Amino acid sequence: MAETATIARPYAEALFRVASESSAGNLGAWSELVSEMGQVAANPDMKAVADDPNVPGDKLAELFLSVLKSPVSDEARRFVQLLVENGRLTVMPDIAEQFHALKNAREGSSDVEITSAFPLEDGQLNDLVAALERKFGRKLYAQVAVDPSLIGGVSVKVGDEVLDTSVRARLAAMQTALTAA
């Protein structure tokens, strides 16, 4: 995995530079397109086609671009052709991840992974994200998951920081304290 991240980095940086300087759209539109490209490239069927040596590069690029729903600029089209020519289309999910990290760094924002024992209502989620934005001092983009094994409460991960206020975490802490005594 480190190898694909290393391969993806220069592509992500080059694409981010092109997206930042492009007059074809804003960085948000580019981010959506790159994210979609990463999802399409991660599809097992697309991986199989990309790994098939009998599929010509121009047909692979054409197929890949035809699956995308977002509008594709000439720069993005050339980028996909470059990936295909270099045999790197399967690295696109890693490129998308690093592109997103570069965008967050530019905007001074971060992704937050919120795991809750129960589904959160919109108001609860908005209040939680607002409180977390105050705590971390930056704009946060929430990705929410439900994990009933938490029993209650939430677990929050921003970068390498984890705030776990779940009942499961409290029970584990109590168990550790009781067995240590």
UniProtKB/Swiss-Prot annotation:
Gene3D superfamilies noted in UniProt: N-terminal domain of the delta subunit of the F1F0-ATP synthase
Subcellular location: Cell inner membrane
Disulphide connectivity of cysteines: none
Membrane topology of this protein: Peripheral membrane protein
Coiled-coil annotated residue ranges, if any: none
UniProtKB keywords: ATP synthesis, Cell inner membrane, Cell membrane, CF(1), Hydrogen ion transport, Ion transport, Membrane, Transport
GO molecular function annotation: proton-transporting ATP synthase activity, rotational mechanism
Any one cellular-component term (Gene Ontology): plasma membrane
InterPro entries for this protein: ATP_synth_OSCP/delta_N_sf (IPR026015), ATPase_OSCP/dsu (IPR000711)
Iron as UniProt keyword: no
Binding partners and assembly: F-type ATPases have 2 components, F(1) - the catalytic core - and F(0) - the membrane proton channel. F(1) has five subunits: alpha(3), beta(3), gamma(1), delta(1), epsilon(1). F(0) has three main subunits: a(1), b(2) and c(10-14). The alpha and beta chains form an alternating ring which encloses part of the gamma chain. F(1) is attached to F(0) by a central stalk formed by the gamma and epsilon chains, while a peripheral stalk is formed by the delta and b chains.
Family: Belongs to the ATPase delta chain family.
HAMAP family membership: ATP_synth_delta_bact
Biological role stated in the UniProt entry: F(1)F(0) ATP synthase produces ATP from ADP in the presence of a proton or sodium gradient. F-type ATPases consist of two structural domains, F(1) containing the extramembraneous catalytic core and F(0) containing the membrane proton channel, linked together by a central stalk and a peripheral stalk. During catalysis, ATP synthesis in the catalytic domain of F(1) is coupled via a rotary mechanism of the central stalk subunits to proton translocation. This protein is part of the stalk that links CF(0) to CF(1). It either transmits conformational changes from CF(0) to CF(1) or is implicated in proton conduction.
Protein name: ATP synthase subunit delta
Species per Swiss-Prot/TrEMBL record: Cupriavidus taiwanensis (strain DSM 17343 / BCRC 17206 / CCUG 44338 / CIP 107171 / LMG 19424 / R1)
